[in-house]
């Protein structure tokens, strides 16, 4: 029996892609009869400030894990201890904070610039969600490729072509409201596209920064559960995701899984799973976004996207994680 310590702290703070990764991983791991899982959580920002979380709780986590006789400790985001006598796995979803520091608050910028090299050095293995993210970790954190494990994200059962669809005529955007997600340019591109009769529906949690969305033809839906999100994908004329930087881009894969045409930035990491399926645009150019939206709406349903997305499952991702844990515990 392998005893795994799993940091689930981010679930208290986010409902975005990181939360999807943690909840999907945890659900799969709990079905593994040969694993015993010890969850760790600092309890959310109401109980500890960001500074205390990063400077007190995480440094103490390996000692707690040793007392609990944990065989492997897995920190599910880049926030992790700087040293650990327990074999340590750290998931780095992306390095946006180093590539685009202006898109983050001051504490996150300062802490990440200082902490990430230490975290990368302490980790026995670093999990990344794409080959692009692997290259970023190697370049920016000087981590050798042999300590990096690429385990792509997956899609769960709700996201499939057949099933209930949301009513209405709309373009769907799934994104946290924060500067890096590039929503103002998406909205401008939507307005320029001239898609008569369609509204833009925005799904996602509040983020940070002065991101203003709204106006005629724009409807904010906030956070929805997975079943409702799948309904929205299936009912959409197209989905659009034009973030300026991602390690993976899970909404693109989820739209594909529902056979919904999807607009996405050209290049990496999207071309690792959406090449030839997504309608590629320049996310810095509203006219390019507008053209992509028009093409996607005209293109209709995309069964090839669903077939491509079927290669990416959370079950496969979970098994890859389990294999890594066993390797480190051996």
Q: Language-model features: where?
A:
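Carbohydrate transferase catalytic cores enriched for Leloir-type hexosyltransferases
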Residues: 1-330
């Amino acid at each position: 029996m392998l005893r795994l310590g799993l940091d689930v702290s981010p679930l208290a703070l986010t409902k975005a892609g990181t939360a999807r990764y943690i909840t999907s991983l945890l659900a799969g791991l709990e079905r593994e009869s040969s694993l015993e899982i010890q969850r760790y959580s600092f309890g959310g920002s109401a109980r500890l400030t960001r500074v205390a979380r990063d400077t007190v709780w995480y440094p103490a986590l390996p000692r707690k894990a040793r007392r609990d006789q944990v065989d492997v400790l897995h920190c599910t985001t880049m926030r992790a201890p700087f040293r650990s006598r327990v074999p340590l796995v750290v998931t780095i979803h992306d390095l946006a904070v180093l590539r685009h520091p202006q898109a983050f608050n001051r504490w996150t910028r300062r802490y990440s610039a200082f902490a990430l090299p230490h975290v990368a050095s302490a980790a026995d293995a670093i999990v990344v969600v794409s080959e692009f993210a692997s290259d970023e970790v190697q370049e920016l954190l000087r981590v050798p490729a042999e300590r990096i494990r690429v385990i792509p994200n997956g899609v769960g059962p709700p996201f499939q072509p057949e099933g209930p669809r949301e009513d209405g005529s709309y373009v769907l955007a799934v994104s946290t409201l924060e500067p890096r997600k590039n929503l103002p340019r998406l909205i401008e591109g939507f307005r320029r596209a001239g898609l008569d009769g369609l509204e833009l529906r925005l799904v996602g949690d509040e983020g940070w920064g002065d991101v203003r969305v709204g106006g005629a033809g724009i409807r904010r839906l906030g956070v929805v559960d997975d079943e409702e999100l799948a309904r929205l994908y299936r009912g959409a004329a197209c989905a659009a995701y034009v973030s300026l930087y991602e390690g993976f881009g899970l909404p693109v894969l989820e739209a594909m899984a529902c056979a919904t045409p999807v607009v996405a930035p050209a290049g990496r990491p999207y071309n690792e799973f959406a090449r030839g399926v997504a309608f590629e645009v320049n996310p810095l150019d509203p006219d390019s976004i507008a053209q992509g939206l028009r093409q996607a709406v005209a293109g209709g349903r995309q069964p090839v996207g669903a077939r491509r997305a079927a290669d990416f499952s959370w079950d496969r991702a979970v098994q890859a994680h389990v294999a890594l844990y066993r390797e480190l515990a051996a």
